[in-house]
C-alpha cells in the first residue's frame, strides 16, 4: 500500500498581497490531489496537508517558487489512509490566532533550540517549561515536568502569562507546541512583555519525536495532531486515540466502552454538555455516515474539522460583537 505523506508547514513572512495567492494555490493543490487546509494571512502561511509523495513534493516546489514562501518550515509524517476529506485555502487575519495586536515574530522572537539540545535545556532546574497547547492536547502527552496552562484556545494564553508568569521571578522560560508555530508567537509575546531569556523547541514536538531516540526522549505519551489520525506516537505513526465527532476530544478505548459513548453522538467528555437539538443532529449525521459507508462512498459531512470550523466562526462572531459593544460603551453611545 502506498503511504500517504502528511505535511505540516508554516512560515511567518510579510505577504501584503496574500489574497492573490489563494486561487492559484488552491488550483495547484486540487490538480495534484493534495487534501487538507492551508491558511493565508498578511503574516504568512500555515496548515497541514496530505497526498502521495509526488504531490507533496510538487506543492513544496510550487511554494518555494513563490515570492516570500521559499525555505518554508515543514515536517513530514506518514499514514495508511488519507487523513483529510477536502482541499481548502482560507484567508485569515492571523495564521495562528492569539488575538493580540502587534505581536510579530519577524521582529522579535525567542531563542530556537534544536531537538538534540532540548533535553539539556529543560533539565535545567532554573528553566520554567510551559506547554503552549490546549488542555485537551496536553492531556494525552507532554514533556516531563511541563506546566499545563489549561487553556481551551490559544487566545487564552496571554491571560495565562499575565496571571502566572513574572519576568522578574521567571528568568528562563522554555516553551513548545506541536509544530513550532504557536511558540513563534508565544515567545514573541513574552519578549514583548519583558521576559529576557525565552526559548522554544525548533520544529516543535513533531521534529523532536523524529530526531530524538525514544530511549533518550523526555516526551511522555502521544502527540495530538489536527487531522483524522488524532494522535501520533514516538514513531510518528497513528496512536491509540480516536476522536469524538461531537466535541473533538480525544478518547481512549476504555472511554468508548462507557455508556456515555455513542459513536458520532457523544462521549464521557460531552454527554452532559450537548443539547437535545445537537444530539438529534449528530444522530442524523451518523446515520448519513453509515449509509455512505454502506454505499462505499465518502461522507464529507462526517469530517470533524467541519464542526470545529463552525464553532470557531461562531466564537469569532461573538467576540467581534462583544468588542463592538465595549467600544460603544467606552464612547458613551449606549
UniProtKB/Swiss-Prot annotation:
| PROSITE patterns (alphabetical) | RHODANESE_3 (PS50206)
User: Which residues are the active-site ones?
Assistant: 177 (cysteine persulfide intermediate)
* Keyword tRNA processing among UniProt keywords: yes
Under the GO molecular function aspect, what terms does this record hold? oxidoreductase activity, acting on paired donors, with incorporation or reduction of molecular oxygen
Which catalysed reactions does the entry list for this protein?
Answer: uridine(34) in tRNA + AH2 + O2 = 5-hydroxyuridine(34) in tRNA + A + H2O
Recite the UniProt keywords alphabetically. Answer: Oxidoreductase, tRNA processing
A GO biological process held by the record: tRNA modification
**Xref: Pfam families:** Rhodanese, UPF0176_N
Q: Which residues form the signal peptide?
A: none
Residue span(s) of domain Rhodanese: 123-217
EC numbers: 1.14.-.-
Which SMART domains does the entry link to?
Answer: RHOD
InterPro entries reported for this sequence: Rhodanese-like_dom, Rhodanese-like_dom_sf, TrhO, TRHO_N
Q: What class of enzyme is it?
A: oxidoreductase
To which protein family does this belong? Belongs to the TrhO family.
What does this chain do?
Answer: Catalyzes oxygen-dependent 5-hydroxyuridine (ho5U) modification at position 34 in tRNAs.
> What name does this protein carry?
tRNA uridine(34) hydroxylase
Organism, scientific name: Shewanella sp. (strain W3-18-1)
The organism's taxonomic lineage, starting at the top? Bacteria, Pseudomonadati, Pseudomonadota, Gammaproteobacteria, Alteromonadales
Gene name of the encoded protein: trhO
